[in-house]
Amino acid sequence: MGQCYYNETIGFFYNNSGKELSLHWRPKDVVVVALGLTVSVLVLLTNLLVIAAIASNRRFHQPIYYLLGNLAAADLFAGMAYLFLMFHTGPRTARLSIKGWFLRQGLLDTSLTASVATLLAIAVERHRSVMAVQLHSRLPRGRVVTLIVGVWAAALGLGLLPAHFWHCLCDLDSCSRMVPLFSRSYLAAWALSSLLVFLLMVAVYTRIFFYVRRRVERMAEHVSCHPRYRETTLSLVKTVVIILGAFVVCWTPGQVVLLLDGLDCKSCNVLAVEKYFLLLAEANSLVNAVVYSCRDAEMRRTFRRLLCCMCLRWSSHKSARYSASAQTGASTRIMLPENGRPLMDSTL
């Protein structure tokens, strides 16, 4: 191991990797920050709504909904991490210390890893409940807690590794171009692990699809309700396509550029698209709320109830303020007497 550069500036590592460090706000930086702030706020609001719905509705106190709540918590964390990134990017990157830079990246890596790992946990739990022919699985709560703790332990482990071990501060030749303080091998490992998660999800949902299709076909042999059979099959196909399609669209571009950078592809212009692909990966935290929660009819009813309650509270608060203001105004409408008779305000 060569010399270590713990006391160097962020600019030193960016220059070493050949990544431009902005000293002023460029149009590209403004566009990325504007889009990033918009996506982050939407992610925070939607996932807060999901968590509130699961907490307030006792029907959702089931293992699969605990996992959905954990997914919403991971995506909420991802929204906050990306919001933190947006306030420490562009020209502000150069002012970060090495510890601050690792904190910025660690928050993002931890939250996104937790989100991806929870997606796999949900797929496995759905597979288990379908094979057991249960609408809501009877998975023990202790096992769910263990699963959730395992997800966050793995996410924290992967998020903290670069700051403590898997960096390039002592080996500048191994530095990544996209993430100049990270080792290229870390990026390759992270991309391959995400790809492995996707392949496992494909395998799990494919097995669910064929199992349910065979079961419905056997039922259709004894019932003449063939349109219902086709409807069930098409609904299942739609669900699987949406789940896997959302993951592919949001994650594949980012995984590809991470892998290319990790493999040290000199001819690949990964820096031209990295910010937009990271934004697309963050958008998955918004898509998850729609795909996994909003398609549930009971969840939608709970959303409407919560939003109606919020609107009613806001309206009642506004009405109370208006009434208080009106009473105050009425008490000041009596004018000074003139010729022995009190004058009333002409606005009455």
Swiss-Prot record:
Keywords, in A-Z order: Cell membrane, G-protein coupled receptor, Glycoprotein, Lipoprotein, Membrane, Palmitate, Receptor, Transducer, Transmembrane, Transmembrane helix
Extracellular topological segments: 1-30, 88-104, 166-185, 261-270
The keyword tRNA processing is annotated on this UniProt entry: no
Placement of sequence motif PDZ-binding: 345-348
Record bears the keyword RNA-binding: no
Ranges in the topological domain labelled Cytoplasmic: 52-66, 125-144, 207-239, 292-348
SUPFAM superfamilies to which the protein is assigned, alphabetical: Family A G protein-coupled receptor-like
TM region positions: 31-51, 67-87, 105-124, 145-165, 186-206, 240-260, 271-291
Lipid sites, type S-palmitoyl cysteine: C308
InterPro entries registered for this protein in UniProt: GPCR_Rhodpsn, GPCR_Rhodpsn_7TM, LPA_rcpt, LPA_rcpt_EDG4
Positions glycosylated per UniProt: N7, N15
GO biological process: G protein-coupled receptor signaling pathway; positive regulation of MAPK cascade; positive regulation of Rho protein signal transduction
Lipid bilayer topology: Multi-pass membrane protein
One Pfam family hit: 7tm_1
Compartments, as annotated in UniProt: Cell surface; Cell membrane
MF terms in GO: lysophosphatidic acid receptor activity; PDZ domain binding
GO cellular component terms listed in the entry, alphabetical order: cell surface; endocytic vesicle; glutamatergic synapse; presynaptic active zone membrane
Tissue specificity of this protein: Most abundantly expressed in testes, kidney, and embryonic brain. Other organs also express the transcript, including heart, lung, spleen, thymus, stomach, and adult brain. Several have little or no expression, including liver, small intestine, and skeletal muscle.
Protein purpose: Receptor for lysophosphatidic acid (LPA), a mediator of diverse cellular activities. Seems to be coupled to the G(i)/G(o), G(12)/G(13), and G(q) families of heteromeric G proteins. Plays a key role in phospholipase C-beta (PLC-beta) signaling pathway Stimulates phospholipase C (PLC) activity in a manner that is independent of RALA activation.
Subunit structure: Interacts with SLC9A3R2/NHERF2, MAGI3 and PLCB3. Interacts with RALA and GRK2.
Protein family: Belongs to the G-protein coupled receptor 1 family.
Protein name as catalogued: Lysophosphatidic acid receptor 2
Species of the source: Mus musculus (Mouse)
Upper lineage: Eukaryota, Metazoa, Chordata, Craniata, Vertebrata
